[in-house]
């Protein structure tokens, strides 16, 4: 057999099928952008659904790919078995109504057995087929020459996921030899059984039937081929190693972990071997997922990443690694995969930062969490129960960042289980609290009742006009149809034509008025009705508004003008964030009002001051360049080909609205915008903050609001300069001078305090008492803080040579206590930490520390003298 690397096998597969007329489909992102049914891309065919279901006709009906994939349904098995992975590559060849069984089988056999390609010994290959698939049997037996005893008929060789395309499949197995099993009395020792000897190499699915709703099967007019070969498994066979982890796709990460830990892989310790495997698998998954735009969080795919990283950190402790280290493996993954996935090395710095940040977050709470979990397990055992309560599991998740699955693994090792239902109940309570906190009492929350029945047409024309002649086509009051609204009454209405924008896409609704003879109606808010019309929330200020009334609908143009400036500014900001922070930045939410804009985006850490400055400057430069804003309607595929940014998770129709700011920004957006960036005037960032793991928020203002903000800041600067008796341009010099003066005064003050402390310490030596042969000093002193107290303690210990000393000071009703024990007395059982804890407890406080020096605090200054009196009792108790 040839000696090949994993990278060579991958390339060889693609080259082979390219020679057979296949188009090579690039590996798609792990984050599915067109399939909301998937959390991750989990197979080679997952990205080709659009071709198989007919939504898109491929240029070439023959396709081959090497698709990176993630499956996380059995994370707990990773590391325990030879071939379970969360990240893997699936090699496949596909036919969309072109060739079928004969070509698929012939080419698979050629690729595996030809000396030009893999070069397997034909005698070591067996195949399985469906019992009724005589066509496949004939091809294997008569054309490929596979003896009938190596063609096994299995009922499970039928691919069916319910309604839709289905069909039989054939699998090819490689015999690894007797070293992996020679007990032929084992009922599982056959190709297709659960064993380590016969490994599945390739699965060929023949989609030839349609599974109908009534359960029947009818032939498909166009038959398809869908095959899959796991690269990791194939590599383990070619490289003749016992598990996938022993291939060159994993060993570099395992080797790097050996270097970091000082431990050895395959050194006879199965528990440590499992840790090496878990780390190698999980870092591959996290590296690729972060590179494709996913970030750790507590929801969805972000939760999967958090769980994987924290599981790896947990296993790293078995290798005596007690610090963040996974981030150091990111460039190792990049090197292994660089031939086919060069983007990993290109993004390695960013990916490593994300991983390190997440590791550091977990390490901060890991120790405390493990201690709490140990207490929970101990308590459960005392109570003779083998179940960890849902409340405790939720506390570990919510406070210490322990994914429920991690708690379950710890519990399993202790012979216990977790009350998963109780945990989910606690999670739901938290979600309810969050939902209650988010509710906006001013928004139109309820749109049920008669609103769901209203299906009259309503056309929005507000992109191009700010006022229209309209008719009231529906009127609702108190959730019921109404014929009229009187002055002072509130209601909801629809217009046949409206210039009022309904709140959506982060942009707030227009406000304004409806006017008619003797009638004036304030439009307070506009939302989408259940059937998609613009629903206006109104208050009648004058007259009576009737259904079918003709009105003039006029929006507040001043308000709209401010809103559109802020909306276009969010588009400029989005692109500037990508330019400065990286292409991983994606919009996570926004709010566009007339006063300000708020933009939430994915990013792993705080945006630095210099980065914010750069972002702000870029946006302003684009404003000052006076760029025209062009808006057009495009087919969704055309818009994506243009590179238009789509908001992840949003559903778009076949035709979309594209907002283009010159050649700088291109987004799909249904909102209102300026005609030219110059209209925005100026852009000023007000704040940047984190609103959750992996999500940041920028708040900013534009136009008049930005001018007023800057005016206020200049006013404050002038006021500060006046108080410092200087002018604004010299204020920094003046501040530096004041800091220097303060520093000098602090130095002089500390020097003076030290002298006074020394004097007081000298005086205190006269107060030393001898208790059972031990020098004891317990005194209340006048010093400013704990630092001065320590200085005095050092002086006294030096002067007395052998003593137990406790000093206390009171400042602003706060008690500081310091205990010291000289070295000679520590060996006799005296302990400063234990002593100071007892003293502090007698004046309402607590503390502790080392045997030679310890500090504490108290809350009751009036009890200090009484507390200090205890010192003599303590010395007597130890000397007995």
Curated annotation (Swiss-Prot):
Q: How is the cofactor bound?
A: Binds 1 zinc ion per subunit.
The name on file for this protein is Alanine--tRNA ligase
Show the GO cellular component annotation of the record: cytosol
**Which controlled-vocabulary keywords does the entry list?**
Aminoacyl-tRNA synthetase, ATP-binding, Cytoplasm, Ligase, Metal-binding, Nucleotide-binding, Protein biosynthesis, RNA-binding, tRNA-binding, Zinc
> Which family does the UniProt entry place this protein in?
Belongs to the class-II aminoacyl-tRNA synthetase family.
SMART domains for the chain: tRNA_SAD (SM00863)
Report the top EC class in one word.
ligase
Where in the cell does this protein reside?
Cytoplasm
Q: Which reaction does it catalyse?
A: tRNA(Ala) + L-alanine + ATP = L-alanyl-tRNA(Ala) + AMP + diphosphate
A GO molecular-function term, please?
catalytic activity, acting on a protein
Describe its function: Catalyzes the attachment of alanine to tRNA(Ala) in a two-step reaction: alanine is first activated by ATP to form Ala-AMP and then transferred to the acceptor end of tRNA(Ala). Also edits incorrectly charged Ser-tRNA(Ala) and Gly-tRNA(Ala) via its editing domain.
Domain free text = Consists of three domains; the N-terminal catalytic domain, the editing domain and the C-terminal C-Ala domain. The editing domain removes incorrectly charged amino acids, while the C-Ala domain, along with tRNA(Ala), serves as a bridge to cooperatively bring together the editing and aminoacylation centers thus stimulating deacylation of misacylated tRNAs.
Fetch the HAMAP family from UniProt: Ala_tRNA_synth_B (MF_00036_B)
Q: Which organism is it from?
A: Bacillus cereus (strain ATCC 10987 / NRS 248)
């Amino acid at each position: 057999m040839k000696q090949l690397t994993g990278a060579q096998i991958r390339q060889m597969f693609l080259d082979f099928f390219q020679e057979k007329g296949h188009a090579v489909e690039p590996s798609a992102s792990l984050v599915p952008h067109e399939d909301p049914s998937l959390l991750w891309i989990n197979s080679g065919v997952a990205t080709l659904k659009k071709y198989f279901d007919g939504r898109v006709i491929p240029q070439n009906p023959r396709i081959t790919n090497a698709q990176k994939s993630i499956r996380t349904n059995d994370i707990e098995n990773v590391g325990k078995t030879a071939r379970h992975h969360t990240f893997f590559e699936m090699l496949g060849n596909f036919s969309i109504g072109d060739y079928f069984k004969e070509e698929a089988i012939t080419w698979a056999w050629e690729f595996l057995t030809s000396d030009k390609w893999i070069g397997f010994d034909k005698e070591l290959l067996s195949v399985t087929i469906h019992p009724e698939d005589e066509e496949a049997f004939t091809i294997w037996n008569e054309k490929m020459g596979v003896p009938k005893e190596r063609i096994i008929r299995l009922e499970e060789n039928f691919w069916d996921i319910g309604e839709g395309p289905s069909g039989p499949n054939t699998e090819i197995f490689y015999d690894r030899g007797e070293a992996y099993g020679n007990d032929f009395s084992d009922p599982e020792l056959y190709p297709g059984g659960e064993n380590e000897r016969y490994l599945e190499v390739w699965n060929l699915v023949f989609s030839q039937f349609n599974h109908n709703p009534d359960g029947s099967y009818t032939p498909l007019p166009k038959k398809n081929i869908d095959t899959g070969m796991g690269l990791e498994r194939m590599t383990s066979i070619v490289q003749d190693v016992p598990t996938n982890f022993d291939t060159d796709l994993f060993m570099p990460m395992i080797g790097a972990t050996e270097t970091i830990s000082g431990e050895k892989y395959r050194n006879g310790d199965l528990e440590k071997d499992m840790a090496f495997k878990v780390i190698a698998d999980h870092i591959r998954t996290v590296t690729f997922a972060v590179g494709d735009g996913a970030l750790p969080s507590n929801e969805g795919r972000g939760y999967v990443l958090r769980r994987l990283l924290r599981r790896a950190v947990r296993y790293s402790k078995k290798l005596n690694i007690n610090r963040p280290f996974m981030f150091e493996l990111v460039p190792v993954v990049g090197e292994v995969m660089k031939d086919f996935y060069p983007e990993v090395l290109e993004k390695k710095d960013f990916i490593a930062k994300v991983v390190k940040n997440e590791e550091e977050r977990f390490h901060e709470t890991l120790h405390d969490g493990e201690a709490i979990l140990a207490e929970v397990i101990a308590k459960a055992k005392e109570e003779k129960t083998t179940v960890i309560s849902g409340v405790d599991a939720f506390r570990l998740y919510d406070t210490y960042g322990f994914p429920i699955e991690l708690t379950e693994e710890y519990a399993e090792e202790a012979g216990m289980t977790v009350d998963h239902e109780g945990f989910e109940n606690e999670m739901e309570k938290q979600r309810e609290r969050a939902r209650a906190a988010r509710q906006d009492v001013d928004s139109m929350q309820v749109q049920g009742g008669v609103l769901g029945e209203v299906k009259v047409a309503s056309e929005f024309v507000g992109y191009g006009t700010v006022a229209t002649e309209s008719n009231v086509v529906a009127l609702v009051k108190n959730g019921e149809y109404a014929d009229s609204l009187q002055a002072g009454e509130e209601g909801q209405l629809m217009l046949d034509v409206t210039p009022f924008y309904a709140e959506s896409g982060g942009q707030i609704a227009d406000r304004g008025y409806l006017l008619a003879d003797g009638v004036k109606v304030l439009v307070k808010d506009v939302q989408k009705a259940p059937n998609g019309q613009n629903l206006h929330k109104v208050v009648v200020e004058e007259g009576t508004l009737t259904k079918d009334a003709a009105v003039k609908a006029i929006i507040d143009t001043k308000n709209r003008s401010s809103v559109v400036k802020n909306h276009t500014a969010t588009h400029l900001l989005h692109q500037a964030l990508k330019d400065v922070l990286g292409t991983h930045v994606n919009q996570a939410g926004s709010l566009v009002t007339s006063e300000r804009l708020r933009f939430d985006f994915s990013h792993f850490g705080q945006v630095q001051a210099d980065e914010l400055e750069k972002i702000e400057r870029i946006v302003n430069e684009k404003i000052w360049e006076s760029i025209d804003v062009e808006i057009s309607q495009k087919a969704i595929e055309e818009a994506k080909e243009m590179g238009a940014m789509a908001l992840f998770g949003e559903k778009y129709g076949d035709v979309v609205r594209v907002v283009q700011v010159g050649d700088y920004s291109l987004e799909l957006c249904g909102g209102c915008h300026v005609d030219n960036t110059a209209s925005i005037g100026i852009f000023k960032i007000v704040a940047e903050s984190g609103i959750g793991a992996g999500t940041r928020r920028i708040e900013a203002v534009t136009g008049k609001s930005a001018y007023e903000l800057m005016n206020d800041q200049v006013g404050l600067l002038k006021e500060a300069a006046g108080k410092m008796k200087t002018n604004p341009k010299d204020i920094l010099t003046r501040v530096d001078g004041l800091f220097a003066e303060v520093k000098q005064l602090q130095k002089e003050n500390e020097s003076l305090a030290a002298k006074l402390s020394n004097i007081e310490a000298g005086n205190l030596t006269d107060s030393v008492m001898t208790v059972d042969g031990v020098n004891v000093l317990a005194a209340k002193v006048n010093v400013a803080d704990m630092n001065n107290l320590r200085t005095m303690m050092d002086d006294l210990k030096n002067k007395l040579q052998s003593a137990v000393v406790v000093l206390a000071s009171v400042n602003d009703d706060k008690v500081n206590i310091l205990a010291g024990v000289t070295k000679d007395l520590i060996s006799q059982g005296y302990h400063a930490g234990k002593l100071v804890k007892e003293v502090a407890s007698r004046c309402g406080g607590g503390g502790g520390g080392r045997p030679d020096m310890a500090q504490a605090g108290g809350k009751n200054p009036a009890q200090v003298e009484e507390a200090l009196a205890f010192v003599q009792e303590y010395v007597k108790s130890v000397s007995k």
